[in-house]
Amino acid sequence: MIEMLIGIAFAGFILAIPYVYERVGGKLSLGKLSLGMPKLRSKKEVEEKIKEVDRELEEVVNAGVSINPKPAEEKVVPLDDANVEPDDNLLEEMETASEIKVEAPEPDEEKLPDIPDLPELNSDLDMDFEDLGQEIPLDADEQEEEEEEEEVEEVEFDEEDDLISSLAKEVETKEEEEIDLLRDLKGQKFSAEELEAELQEMIQRLKVLSGGSS
């Protein structure tokens, strides 16, 4: 692309030289640069010069194209038009591979041991519900132990009953004695000291009785 632009600029410059030369009178001044060219004699020579410039320009363009060639387009051949010859060995390998995949052994499953025929579980679960209401017989030792425990409990209860009844009788007798004592003292005269002594004695006896009953 750059070479083509340079060639076009060069051709334009060459074509402009004769025109400028005729106008100026044979001299071209560019700043301090003076360029003198001989006067062209005829129009035919000018045309030949132009053709020469065109040839040079065409050569430059062709050179630029050859330097940067376009990438060749890949030719796509359709499958229908292409002559495809399958390889027999390839087909055989594909068939053997498919057979190997099909005939691949399945993973061995864990085999459970053979379980013998179990007896009917319902036969063990058959129960006579009518017998549930009856008492379960106990061993002789267990019966004796229960009887001994019952006897001990009866003895303990009997002793407690006797103790309570004896304490109740003592309290009754003490109350009767106190009542009789008050009856005996009725209508009699005593000094204050004697009454105080009697009362203290009665208080002590009551304390003793209350402590014994508790």
Curated annotation (Swiss-Prot):
Residues 99-162 are annotated as: Disordered. It comes from the Archaea. The keyword Coiled coil applies. Keywords: Coiled coil. Residues 39-68, 138-212 form a coiled coil. Residues 99-114 have a biased composition (Basic and acidic residues). Residues 123-162 have a biased composition (Acidic residues). This is Uncharacterized protein AF_1047. It comes from Archaeoglobus fulgidus (strain ATCC 49558 / DSM 4304 / JCM 9628 / NBRC 100126 / VC-16). The lineage of its organism: Archaea, Methanobacteriati, Methanobacteriota, Archaeoglobi, Archaeoglobales.
